[in-house]
Regions:
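Ubiquitous "structural anchor" signal
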Residues: 27, 33, 57, 119-124, ...
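Generic N-terminal targeting/processing segments that precede catalytic cores or assembly contacts
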Residues: 1-106, 127-217
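A structural signal for small-residue-enriched, beta-sheet-centric alpha/beta enzyme cores
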Residues: 3-6, 13, 19, 214-223, ...
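Intrinsically disordered, low-complexity terminal tails and inter-domain linkers enriched
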Residues: 93-144, 278-310
Length: 318
């Protein structure tokens, strides 16, 4: 199903995010593990409420694992990740008692005994509590059963202030939920509530990341798996604002108290020349006392210049 938006009286085709690609690939790989056969296509409903159906590519499998890829389609948006393959490798983790342990941990955390009963409640309230606990388990189990990590071409977080903690794969929260929900639905349908490991990789992401803002944000070694709606809207102002907000969060986590932003190429060029000259003067005059502030100012200038004059970071605009 193709979706379009209008920008400046132009009809532009929407695409789908790397997060949607990852979830669809994971869905396809897990389906193979459960059924032993590949589908030609996979489909899911994005958080925006728009269904996406894609072809599966690079389908391979081995003893206890399966892997496939989905090709990113950014629609009419300019995006360095357009056309790259997003892979998902699925493996069942062998732990016979895992589900029982997860179930018991949820019962205990809810104040229930081993039989699922909570002391001191009437039979009717016990029944209601059991229903509530079952709903709680259903909500929590996808996170418990589906482990997600990044492989080659997926960046690693090295700075605070981003969506994921330092050391984690740069797979944002919404894509993680999309992956877990897609996988858990298949497990539940098959009656196979087993621990699954999902590894997302983008071999072309190593080179693509060099054209993105990720290195400045503290995301090293690859691209990010992104998307809050699952859909790429071409020339999205909201995505531009979110890109700037992400960098500001990183600067805030580093203790920066101010940044400088400018409109357009002329403003960026003026800021670059003025801050470098003024910063050098201040540093010389005060024997380096303003060096940290000068570095901060120059970095702020680079941020403004990079984002506002050369185009917004494409892989962050999903």
């Amino acid at each position: 199903m193709e979706t379009f938006v209008y920008k400046d009286h132009k009809k532009l085709r929407c695409g789908y995010t790397t997060g949607t690609c990852a979830a669809l690939a994971a869905q396809g790989a897990v389906r193979f593990l459960l059924t032993g056969s590949w589908r030609e296509t996979e489909e899911l409903m994005t958080p925006k409420g728009i269904p996406v159906r894609v072809a599966l590519e690079e389908k391979t499998s081995g003893d206890g694992w399966a892997e496939c890829a989905v090709r990113k389609d950014a629609g009419d948006d300019y995006d360095v990740t357009n056309g790259i393959l997003v892979y998902a490798r699925a493996e069942f983790v062998k732990d016979k008692n895992f589900y029982e342990k997860v179930q018991m941990s949820h019962l205990e955390s809810s104040g229930f005994g081993a039989a699922g009963e909570k002391p001191g409640l009437s039979p009717e309230n016990q029944k209601q509590q059991k229903k509530a606990n079952a709903a709680h388990q259903k909500e929590a189990l996808p996170e418990s059963l589906v482990r997600i990590d990044g492989g080659i071409g997926i960046g690693r977080i090295t700075k605070s202030g981003l969506d994921q903690p330092v050391g984690a794969a740069a797979i944002n929260s919404v894509p993680r939920k999309m992956i877990r929900d897609a996988v858990y639905e298949l497990l539940e349908e098959a009656g196979e509530l087993r621990l699954v490991s999902i590894t997302i990789s983008v071999p072309a992401g190593v080179e693509a990341a060099k054209k993105t803002f990720n290195p400045r944000l503290g995301i090293q070694g690859g691209i990010s798996i992104l998307g809050t709606s699952g859909i790429v809207e071409p020339m999205s102002e909201e995505a531009l604002v979110e890109t700037i907000r992400t960098h500001l969060n990183v600067l805030k986590a580093e203790g920066r108290k101010w940044v400088i932003a400018v409109p357009g190429n002329m403003g960026a060029g003026f800021l670059e020349r003025y801050l470098v000259e003024h910063g050098k003067f201040c540093t010389d005059a005060h024997q380096g006392s303003n060096a940290a502030d000068t570095d901060a100012a120059v970095e702020a200038e680079q941020m403004a210049y990079g984002e506002l004059s050369t185009g917004t970071e494409p892989s962050l605009l999903e």
